[in-house]
Amino acid sequence: MRVAEVTRNTSETQIRVSLNLDGSGRQKLASGVPFLDHMLDQIARHGMFDLEVEATGDTHIDDHHTVEDVGITLGQAVARAIGDKKGITRYGHSYVPLDECLSRVVIDFSGRPGLEFHVPFTRARVGSFDVDLTIEFFRGFVNHAGVTLHIDNLRGINAHHQCETVFKAFGRALRMAVELDPRAANTIPSTKGTL
């Protein structure tokens, strides 16, 4: 089974992430940031991952450290669960619509962290959630999962829909990329022989 549990403790946050890449979309989420929990639910359900997140942090200051550190810890959990990358599809992509909104996410388990994030949010907050923290979540994930990630909101008016389509598309793209390809069996999906 491709599972991992990662704990991250700093002076700002205490995070625990448990992940099963071959799950059924079950989740248990308690990040302390309700909108983040809603977005993590999208990743679990649309990626078909079993995901548990427990976090406490300095949310009395703001949500920045918690959101970023959950992204970091999730990235570490994915990297650990995927192991040597033998047999994975490597690349994943997804387009997800929600009413007027359309987002595209493309991921490559290249071993080279890189983020292209193009989401022109139409407002600064969704409820109490600062939408600027979305990029911090994905930057933390990318740097610790070792992936190249392109996120584009192609159109949208409602900032909640913009966030939600991004996270849904991310879950689906991630699911595609980590899927085991029986034809590739025990090979690394690279002409270099390593990722």
From Swiss-Prot:
One of its GO terms (cellular component) is cytoplasm. Belongs to the imidazoleglycerol-phosphate dehydratase family. This is Imidazoleglycerol-phosphate dehydratase. The keyword Cytoplasm applies. InterPro entries: IGPD_sf, ImidazoleglycerolP_deHydtase, ImidazoleglycerP_deHydtase_CS, Ribosomal_Su5_D2-typ_SF. It comes from Cupriavidus necator (strain ATCC 17699 / DSM 428 / KCTC 22496 / NCIMB 10442 / H16 / Stanier 337) (Ralstonia eutropha). Keywords: Amino-acid biosynthesis, Cytoplasm, Histidine biosynthesis, Lyase. It is found in: Cytoplasm. Pathway: Amino-acid biosynthesis; L-histidine biosynthesis; L-histidine from 5-phospho-alpha-D-ribose 1-diphosphate: step 6/9. One of its GO terms (biological process) is L-histidine biosynthetic process.
